[in-house]
Amino acid sequence: MSKGTPSMGKCHKRTHVRCRRCGRLSYNFNRKTCVACGFGRSKRLRSYKWMRKAGY
């Protein structure tokens, strides 16, 4: 393995694609889970109390 510029070429792939449930570009293709709504991880929508307070 080499460090620096040659290894930066491996970072060009898309990590997140469009989610089937929420439609946002936050579905991790490798982990098969959505960061925004929790699709693939749980049946329920991902929501927390601090989200209401923060305006999400």
Swiss-Prot record:
UniProt keyword Cytoplasm present: no
A GO-annotated cellular component: cytosolic large ribosomal subunit
Zn finger spans (C4-type): 19-37
Required cofactor names: Zn(2+)
Lineage: Archaea, Methanobacteriati, Methanobacteriota, Stenosarchaea group, Methanomicrobia
InterPro entries, per the entry: Ribosomal_eL37 (IPR001569), Ribosomal_eL37/eL43 (IPR011331), Ribosomal_zn-bd (IPR011332)
Record's protein name: Large ribosomal subunit protein eL37
Tagged with keyword Iron-sulfur: no
Gene Ontology molecular functions: rRNA binding; structural constituent of ribosome; zinc ion binding
Species, as recorded: Methanothrix thermoacetophila (strain DSM 6194 / JCM 14653 / NBRC 101360 / PT) (Methanosaeta thermophila)
Cofactor, how bound (note): Binds 1 zinc ion per subunit.
